[in-house]
Structure formats: C-alpha cells, structure tokens
Amino acid sequence: MRRFLGVTLVSAMAMLLSPAHSVAQPVRQGSAVERFSDRLQTALNSGSASALDTLASVDLQPVLAQRLARFQQDFPEVTWQVKPAAPTPDGRPTLTLRVRGVAESEGLTYALEASEEIAIRLDNGQLVEQELLAQQSLLRSGERPLAVKVAIPDVVLTGSRYDVDLIVEEPLGQALVAGGLINLTDEQLLAQMRPTLPLAPQGGGGLFKSVQAPQQPGSQSWAVMLVHPDGVVTATKRVRVVSSN
C-alpha cells in the first residue's frame, strides 16, 4: 500500500471549486475574463497565497488561501498557465489551468503535469461562482519517467460501465509491476487527504480496470497508481456522469 500524493494535487487544482457553488447564468464578459486570466496566472506563480485575495470574493478567500498553501507544501516548484477557453454550450465563460513542475514524496522526485477546466462568473473583476468541468493529473518519478497514456473517458452515462486504464506505451515485459485504483470521495478531496491505495500485481502493459458509473448524474474522481522497477506513476481524472434520458 502507498499514500497517494496526487489527491492533494486534485483538491488544490480544484481550489477554484466549491461544491456548493455553480455558475447559474452566462455573462458576456470576454475582455474581463482575459484580464482575470492574466491576473490569476500572475497570482498563482507569485507563490503567495494572499495574492489571490484581490481575485476572489470575501466568502471564497479563506478557502482559496488554505488550499493553495497546502498545495505549495507538496508542490513548491511549479509553473502555472491560465488561458481563457471556449464558452460552454450555454454561453458560460471558461478557463483552462495547467501546471507543471516537480514534487517530492517518500524519497521520490516526481515530474508533474496537470490541467483543469472551470466555468466562472465574475463580479467587478472578482471570482464569485465557479464550476469544475474537467480535471486530470499525472505524476511520474524516476530518472527517466515512464511513458504512459491515461485512457479514461471525459463523460459517461449514468449506470454505464466504462474502462479506467493506465497504459504503458513501451510495455515492461516480464518486469514486476503493481498497481491500484480508488474512487476519491468529495470529502477526501475537500480535506486534501492522502488515502492509502491498495496495490496488486499487474501485467507489464499497465493497469486496466472496468468500473461502474453511479445511477445519478454528477461526477467520479479516480486515482490510479502504478509502481514499476524504475519508479512510480500516479494519475487522477474527474469523469462527468450525465443522464441517459
């Protein structure tokens, strides 16, 4: 079993997300979104949690500061990129956030790649509401990080079965590999917990699992780990669950 560092990343990458908030109405504010995007990128790259204070409403500021501070403990050397993205089908403005860098955990150094997409609503240049639309991350340790592909769908239907795969692009042959998968709860994400992930022997080609979507619309957040002779690969992804009706 191993502690899963990636869950801290998931919850911190979702620092602009509060499950109690969702964007209600589209707003025409293209230039305002571009300005906010630039300011957010500057604030995230400043390394100061207080830099977000001018970007968010008073209600959101404490949550943002706490989550960013925790994130910086585990991932102190990262670079953020924030860009406006295409509006949602109902006209809501969106942002794409990407982060790259390195992290250390349990004596291993990880290369980090992660991204998320959020729908937002601004009021006088401040973030007041948001909705997480997509999220995924990849952490790889070792002098030569293992080339892998995260094959998990973005959207699935309620009640359907679907595959959660972490594919090794250059199979390891007879090498001993162990892997595991867990469904992260909202409570684990909000608390920025590091759950213990049980591992089992896997083939050299990666980890391949079939999972069940819930019967109600919403989302599922998956955490996957693969331990190989040269290091560790961890990945996360949020899957939207939509009604089949």
Feature locations, PLM:
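Contiguous segments within soluble domain cores/interaction surfaces
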Residues: K149, D154-F208, A235
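Short, low-complexity N-terminal intrinsically disordered segments enriched in polar/charged residues
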Residues: R3-F4, S18-N45
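Bacterial N-terminal signal peptides
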Residues: T8-L17
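Short, aromatic- and glycine-rich surface loops/edge beta-strands on solvent-exposed regions
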Residues: S210-D230
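Short beta-strand edge segments in extracellular beta-sheet folds
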Residues: R238-N245
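Short solvent-exposed beta->alpha transition segments
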Residues: R28, E34, A49-A103, G107-T109
